[in-house]
Structure formats: C-alpha cells, structure tokens
Regions:
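Flexible, acidic glycine-rich loops studded with aromatic residues
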Residues: 67-83, 87-249
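Active-site neighborhood of glycoside hydrolase catalytic domains
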Residues: 1-83, 88-101
Length: 249
C-alpha cells in the first residue's frame, strides 16, 4: 500500500467490522483471552480486539513515516494520538466527544452520502441505496454546528461520499455528483454563517450552462426536472450493462 500511495496518510477503513463473527470465531475468542480483553467502560471485548489491531497498524505506519486515517469506529477502545478520524454517524453534539481529541474529517451520512436519491419521486430516479438528499440539503450542512471551540481546530475538512454499488455508467456517476459537488464546494470554502441558498441557487444556472457545454449529465431537480434523460438511463440488468459496454467499444 505504501508503495502504491506515497501520501502522508493511509486510510485503513475500520468501519463495518463484523464483531458478531469475531465473537463466534474460536481463534478470535482465543486472542481476546490471550490479551486479557473483556467488556468494560462501555466497550466490548471484540471492540477492544479491533483497537488492538488498529494500534498495531498505526505503529507500523508511524514507524514508516505515515499516519492513519480511519472511520470513527476506530475510536472504540483506546486510540493513540496522531490518528485522523472520519466521522459519518452524526454531526456536532451527536458525535462521540472523543472525536475532538483528534484531527478529523466531517462526512455525516445525512448530508454527505451522495449515493442517495435527489428527489422524492424515486420511481423516476435511477435506482439508489435509498433515503433522500437533494442539493439544498447538501448545501445546508454547517460543519461547525454543535462543535465545541476546541473541536473546531481539529476539523481538517469535509468529504462527500458516492458509494457506487448501484452506479454502473459514467452518466449515472455524473448525475449523482452534479450539482451536489457544487454545494459541497461552498460547504468547504464559505466561512461559517455566510452561505446563502438563494444566491447559490441562482449561481447554479451558470454551473448548469458549464455542464451543458461540457456534455455532462447532471440532476435537474433544482430546475423542476426529475430523472435521467432517456439516452443516459443506467443499466438495470447484466444484459443491459453488457449492451452499454459494447456500445462504448
């Protein structure tokens, strides 16, 4: 990994760790017993086992001049200084207060998971993971809301995530990104309390003209138009996907 990615940071993930499987695994249970891990202080033995693994990876990377980034599950147990934590579960006062002891990246699912539907008319939208996240909701995210002053100094930035389980064409990808990426940009660079939705909404007309000039596919729900154009519909079956791929060769 370090040969492939020369950056200072290496993201080790750390979320979606199947603790139930660890608890059912004889080797994992034996390792917990060997390490003297047990449920205490609001954490399970399996969570402390993950912390043990995280600490070993962190030391290895630190010894090689790198730093770890991980999702907020790496806070479970004891996390050494120097880690960077990505939070996805909530915002401000709703996150684990220990987050503010580390450099962090804000990526709350309610605002920054842009694999969600962009309109309430989901039957006319390309199939998605679910939920509803229009461009105005992305724009409405205030990273500092509910964050203590000392915590604001630890926020490195904001990240949006487009998980692509259902995204199988470039046009579909563009549709999910645009214009929500424009909203993300203002969340990132406009000073706290200075965003203005009405101004931004008018500016989207200019952005749309650029998208059109570049031949990009984008969501037009902000203009009252729902769904992908007919010539950019995503493949919904393996056969449709193969037909699409053949047409691009």
């Amino acid at each position: 990994m370090m040969d492939i990615f020369p950056s200072k940071y290496i993201n080790i993930g750390g979320d979606e760790v199947p603790k139930d499987r660890w608890n059912a695994c004889p080797r994992c249970r034996a390792k917990m017993k060997e390490l003297g891990l047990y449920d205490h202080d609001g954490h399970t033995a399996a969570q402390y086992l993950q912390n043990y693994v995280t600490a070993r990876i962190q030391k290895f990377l630190n010894d090689h001049g790198r730093r770890i980034i991980g999702w907020e599950e790496i806070l479970e147990g004891d996390l050494a200084e120097g880690a960077t934590v990505m939070t996805w579960k909530g915002t401000g006062e709703n996150v684990d207060s220990r987050l503010w002891n580390y450099d962090c990246i804000m990526s709350p699912r309610g605002y920054m998971y842009i694999d969600r539907y962009q309109s309430h008319e989901q039957d006319r939208e390309p199939f998605s993971i679910g939920a509803y996240l229009p461009v105005e909701n992305v724009y409405g995210y205030e990273p500092y809301d509910g964050v203590p002053e000392y915590g604001k100094k630890r926020i490195l930035g904001v990240q949006a995530n487009l998980w692509t389980e259902y995204v199988n064409t470039p046009e579909y990808l563009e549709y999910m990104l645009l214009p929500r990426l424009a909203a993300l940009s203002e969340v990132q660079w406009v000073q706290e309390g200075h965003k203005d939705w009405e101004r931004f909404r008018k500016a989207l007309d200019h952005s749309a003209a650029i998208y059109d000039e570049m031949g990009l596919t984008y969501c037009k729900y902000a203009w009252g138009i729902v769904g992908l154009p007919e010539n950019a519909q995503p493949a919904r079956t393996p056969e449709e996907l193969q037909k699409y791929l053949d047409s691009r060769n």
